[in-house]
């Protein structure tokens, strides 16, 4: 069994990790930390986990206990993993970080977007960006994995086939993305209150969202050149889900885009390219580690529209983290993740 530690288990990504790992036949959660909830039983805080973690309680983070684990997940706000990751890596423990701490390769760029100096720039050279559909072989050999964000996952998977094939104009990319309220986290905030978010939709961070440099970094690597991206996120009155409507200019009308996408993702267990003319729904991926994609060329013109949907807490966070765990430890990539989405 893989001995697992989780730092920061009281947020939505933390409890989603617990839910997924409870179904994993080769992983056992030995340590879960929370300074504010130390001593509280996991099953008392999350009744949905009763019968799965009845002997596990939250504890104050202890480097010795965490270093005894084979792998430690960080489901924490940005900046926390900076302080602990180096010590764990030195002890031989693998680190899978769900926060943004090691996603950007440039420490100065990270500091610009997150408003504080990067706390462990010396570790950036060791960090592998954990998008399996791009970096699977690097993940197998990694010590430190940076799990992609939710918007970046849906957006990159949608654009990748076009950019890798050199078909899309890289200077004219648009990502119009909608997120459920759980993407804002579990902390109390006026904008996340039911009376504020219900029956309403709004754009936010139009001047620049923290996921913009992460998306741009990935698309730039895929295109092999600089890219121009307009990214506009929206908050929608649902709990889970990301819906990305992606626009790219593709002048070559002879290309069979459906075949291109199907070929690119033919061997990917968690990317579902839907039949031509489809419109994927966020509800179809709720609770599942799946990205569903459909590609369109409206009116046969130069503009290509890609629709990409994920569950922000699963393929956009905790599910993708477990997918990385499976790859890292040489397991079947689908282990503990093959359940279907929840309907209705």
UniProtKB/Swiss-Prot annotation:
It catalyses: N-acetyl-L-glutamate 5-semialdehyde + phosphate + NADP(+) = N-acetyl-L-glutamyl 5-phosphate + NADPH + H(+). GO terms for molecular function: N-acetyl-gamma-glutamyl-phosphate reductase activity; NAD binding; NADP+ binding. Its EC number is 1.2.1.38. InterPro entries: AGPR_AS, AGPR_type-1, NAD(P)-bd_dom_sf, NAGSA_dehydrogenase, Semialdehyde_DH_NAD-bd. Gene3D superfamilies: Dihydrodipicolinate Reductase, domain 2, NAD(P)-binding Rossmann-like Domain. One of its GO terms (cellular component) is cytoplasm. GO terms for biological process: L-arginine biosynthetic process. The keyword Cell division does not apply. Keywords: Amino-acid biosynthesis, Arginine biosynthesis, Cytoplasm, NADP, Oxidoreductase. It is found in: Cytoplasm. Belongs to the NAGSA dehydrogenase family. Type 1 subfamily. PANTHER family: N-ACETYL-GAMMA-GLUTAMYL-PHOSPHATE REDUCTASE, CHLOROPLASTIC-RELATED, N-ACETYL-GAMMA-GLUTAMYL-PHOSPHATE REDUCTASE, CHLOROPLASTIC-RELATED-RELATED. This is N-acetyl-gamma-glutamyl-phosphate reductase. It comes from Pseudomonas putida (strain W619). The gene is argC.
């Amino acid at each position: 069994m893989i001995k697992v530690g989780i730092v920061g288990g009281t947020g939505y990504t933390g409890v989603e990790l617990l839910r997924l790992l409870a179904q994993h036949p080769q992983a056992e959660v030995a340590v879960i930390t929370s300074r504010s909830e130390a001593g509280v039983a996991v099953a008392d805080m999350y009744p949905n986990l009763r019968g799965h973690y009845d002997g596990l309680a939250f504890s104050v983070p202890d480097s010795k206990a965490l270093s005894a684990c084979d792998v430690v997940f960080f489901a924490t706000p940005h900046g926390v993993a900076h302080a602990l990751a180096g010590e764990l890596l030195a002890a031989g423990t693998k680190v899978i970080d769900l926060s943004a701490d090691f996603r950007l390769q440039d420490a100065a760029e990270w500091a610009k977007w997150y408003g504080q100096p990067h706390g462990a720039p010396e570790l950036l050279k060791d960090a592998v960006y954990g998008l399996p559909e791009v970096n699977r072989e690097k993940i197998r050999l990694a010590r430190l994995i940076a799990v992609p964000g939710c918007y970046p996952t849906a957006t990159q998977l949608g654009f990748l086939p076009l950019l890798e094939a050199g078909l899309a104009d890289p200077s004219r990319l648009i990502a119009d993305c909608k997120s459920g309220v759980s993407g804002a986290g579990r902390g109390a905030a006026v904008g996340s209150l039911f009376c504020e978010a219900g029956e309403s939709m709004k754009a936010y961070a139009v001047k620049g969202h923290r996921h913009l440099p992460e998306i741009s970094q990935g698309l730039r690597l895929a295109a092999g050149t600089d890219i121009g991206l307009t990214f506009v996120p929206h908050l929608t009155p649902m709990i889970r889900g990301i819906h990305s409507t992606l626009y790219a200019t593709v002048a070559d009308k002879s290309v069979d885009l459906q075949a291109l996408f199907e070929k690119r993702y033919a061997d990917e267990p968690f990317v579902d390219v839907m039949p031509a003319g489809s419109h994927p729904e966020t509800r179809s991926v709720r609770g599942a580690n799946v990205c569903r994609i459909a590609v369109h060329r409206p009116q046969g013109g130069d503009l290509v529209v890609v629709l990409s949907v994920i569950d922000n807490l699963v393929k956009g966070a905790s599910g993708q983290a477990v997918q990385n765990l499976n790859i890292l430890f040489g397991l079947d990539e689908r282990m503990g993740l093959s359940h279907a989405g929840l309907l209705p």
